[in-house]
C-alpha cells in the first residue's frame, strides 16, 4: 500500500474511532438474483469485540450476507459501513478495507497441518508483515 492510501485509511479510522459508531453497520441490505430475493432489508450493527452468529436454514441467505459484507457479492440495494466508510460505494477502494477483514468460506481450504489460529494469522503475517502477536490480537 502506498503512503497516500495508508494516510487516507488512518484518517478515516481516526474519524470513525471518535464517532462511537459501530465497527460494521448494515442498512437495508438487499441482494437479488433475478426474481430470487436472497436478502431483503437486512439491517444490523456490529460493534468492535462483538461475537456474532449467522444462523438459518439452507438457502436462507447466510453465505450471501457474508459475501456482501466482504463485497465479494455486490448488494442490489442498501449500504454497508466498515469503520464509518461506505464500502458499497463503488468509489471506495475495497482492497484497503479487505486488508482488515477476513473470512473463512463454507467450502474452505485451510492448511490441515496448522491450527485454526495459524491459518487465520497467516495472511496478515505474510501479506502485511504483521507480527504474530499483532495478527493474533486482531
What are these regions (language model features)?
Residues 55-57:
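The feature captures the beta-strand-to-loop junction immediately N-terminal to the Walker
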Residues 113-123:
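Short coil-to-helix segment of the ABC ATPase nucleotide-binding domain corresponding to the Q-loop/switch region
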Residues 78-89:
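Conserved ABC transporter NBD signature motif
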Residues 23, 36-37, 95:
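Short coil-to-beta microelement around the adenine-binding A-loop and adjacent beta1/P-loop entry
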Residues 34, 52, 90-91, 121-134:
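ABC-type ATPase nucleotide-binding domains, specifically the catalytic core motifs of the NBD
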Residues 1-30:
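ABC-family P-loop ATPase nucleotide-binding domain
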Residues 87-102, 132-133:
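ABC ATPase NBD coupling module
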Residues 70:
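Helix-to-loop junction immediately C-terminal to a conserved catalytic motif
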Amino acid at each position: 500500500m502506498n503512503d497516500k492510501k495508508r494516510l487516507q485509511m488512518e484518517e478515516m479510522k481516526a474519524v470513525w474511532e471518535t464517532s462511537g459508531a459501530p465497527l460494521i453497520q448494515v442498512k437495508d441490505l438487499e441482494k437479488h438474483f433475478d426474481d430470487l430475493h436472497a436478502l431483503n432489508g437486512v439491517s444490523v450493527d456490529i460493534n468492535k469485540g462483538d461475537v456474532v452468529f449467522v444462523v438459518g436454514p439452507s438457502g436462507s441467505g447466510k453465505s450471501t450476507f457474508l459475501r456482501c459484507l466482504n463485497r465479494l457479492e455486490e448488494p442490489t440495494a442498501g449500504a454497508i459501513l466498515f469503520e464509518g466508510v461506505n464500502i458499497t460505494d463503488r468509489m471506495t477502494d475495497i482492497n484497503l478495507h479487505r486488508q482488515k477483514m477476513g473470512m473463512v468460506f463454507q467450502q474452505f481450504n485451510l492448511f490441515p497441518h496448522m491450527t485454526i489460529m495459524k491459518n487465520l494469522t497467516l495472511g496478515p503475517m505474510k501479506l502485511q508483515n504483521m507480527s504474530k502477536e499483532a495478527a493474533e490480537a486482531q
